[in-house]
Amino acid sequence: MNSFKRIPFFNLVILLAVSCWGHAFAQTPPVAIKPIRPSQKASVMQTIGVTDITITYSRPPVKGRPIFADAPASMESRHPGEATLDNQNERKAGEPIVPYNHVWRAGANEATLFQVTDDVLINGQPLKAGSYSLHTIPGKDEWTVIFNNDPGQWGSFSYDSKKDALRVKTKPQMVADNQEWLMYSFDPVTDDSAQVNIRWEKLKVPFTVQVKDVKSAWRSKADATIAANPTNEVLPLQVANQYAAWKNYDEALKFVDSSIKTKETFRNLSAKANILWAAGRKDDAIATADAAIARGKADKADTAAFEKRVADMKAGKL
């Protein structure tokens, strides 16, 4: 005889419902009220080519306090070596917020977060794509900028130099205007680089982020996207258009042909005609243009503007 008691169906339904509700409740994140921080959170982002660089940090104010200075002996003795002295609970009146020769979070609250989507050069030194905590060691005449492999730490209190991915040197610059709230900026920016500036009080600390080969980084991502979407004829066409803009017509034709092979459309045939024309292959361009118009009419596409362009091609007006 079965020793288990039968559970009435209605009771079983109730038990299951309560169980599911309890599980859902357990998965709900806790409710919290966001505090107002004296050092407010900020983020700045710059794209170089197709590489995104994002810096997330907190912005402490000066508020008349001494910022950059040598640590007095009493302060220095608390944490010897490079260890951070950035502890407001230990700091005495008149002591600097950022004492020289000690690790600083380059912000407030959590360690400053530096994220980059591709491999880059920092002041000419290689840094892999990834997320890093950014720390500095300030000095009167030279600063060390540190990219550390522990991105989730609070301040620099658990900073471990063994986890450093990169250290670079830079020269601080005195400026005339006072920056009350610490600020990161990207300026100047070029086609393949951006200068990051840490500004606070009357000091600017710059370092450069460079993408070694912008076009190769773009091509690598383009190839990966096309490989992941082999039936999408638009993607290789987009690559073809980019190469055409660079006047690299051989590569442009290679990709537009790939698009046509995937699926022949008025859009990619007309694009090929324009590329051939730009490359100086006028007879091939006109033949392809006629094929594009025929394809467009068959697909009920609007070919009017392109037909006018082709007429100008044939009349020698372009």
Name every feature range the model reports, one short phrase each:
Residues 56-129, 135-232, 246, 263:
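Extended, well-structured beta-strand/loop surface patches
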Residues 291-318:
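Terminal, low-structured helical/coil segments at or just beyond the last alpha-helical repeat
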Residues 239-240, 272, 310:
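Structural register within alpha-helical repeat arrays
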